[in-house]
Amino acid sequence: MQDLQRYVNEILKESGNKRVFSFEFEGRKFWLKRVEKVIKGGILTKIFKPDPYRSFAAEIKKLEILNAANAPAAKLALKGEDFFVIEDAGEPISRLFKKSEDENFKREILNEAARALAGLHALNFAHGRPALRDLAYKNGEIKFLDFESKFFSDDLELKKCRDLLVFIHELFRQQASNELVTSAVSEYVSAGGEKIRSRSLELTQKFRFLYYLLLPFKFLNKKDLTAAIRTFEYLLPIVKTKK
């Protein structure tokens, strides 16, 4: 650890104003992130954006809590007042999914992601926005990155439901087929997520009016909009079968 600390001290001096960058130490890859000392944007952004040091300390605290619980999250290797270092967690699933033309591989990687999400929820954590770019794959393991800022807020069950719905939306956003989505959701349920799936279906039914508001704009062919419509069109028939 002391050797890593000394090495990091040196590269901090040499890295200029880089906020996030990777480096290798003793044959292993790490990522270093610095606090955002200069807040970019207009005057309102600077007034209302949370104190960067407080937000940064909260980000470190999240990682410490997740690591202590052995949750599927990036491992904190080193921390300081204005920086932290995590072990490399692998390649983003979004990139792996886009690069591959092998449907079996796509199914396998999405199923792994679904099981990891269920595992995170089983430990009573929620991510907040499990986009595929925030899930990394390495050596057969999935790790979550960039947990939402409201990590410590209440109503954990609702946050888990939001995770699952965002995850399904993200799969459609990446143009996954209904078959791949069904396989991933089944893996989530098999890994202990039935209660959250049921509650998520209830929420889909409760907010189904949004589907009818969005549908007339389908012709715009916007990625997030199309994914939202596909999410409703996938889940609403399932809701009907549960009645």
Q: Can you describe what each PLM-predicted range is?
A:
Residues 49-69:
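The N-lobe alphaC helix and its flanking beta3-alphaC-beta4 segment of protein kinase-like domains
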Residues 143, 147-243:
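C-lobe/activation-segment region of protein kinase-like
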Residues 66, 117-123:
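Conserved hydrophobic alpha-helix
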Residues 10-11, 16-56:
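ATP-binding glycine-rich loop module of kinase domains
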Residues 134-144:
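Conserved protein kinase catalytic/activation segment
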Residues 52-55, 73-110:
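Conserved structural core of kinase catalytic domains
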Residues 122-132:
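Catalytic-loop of the protein kinase fold
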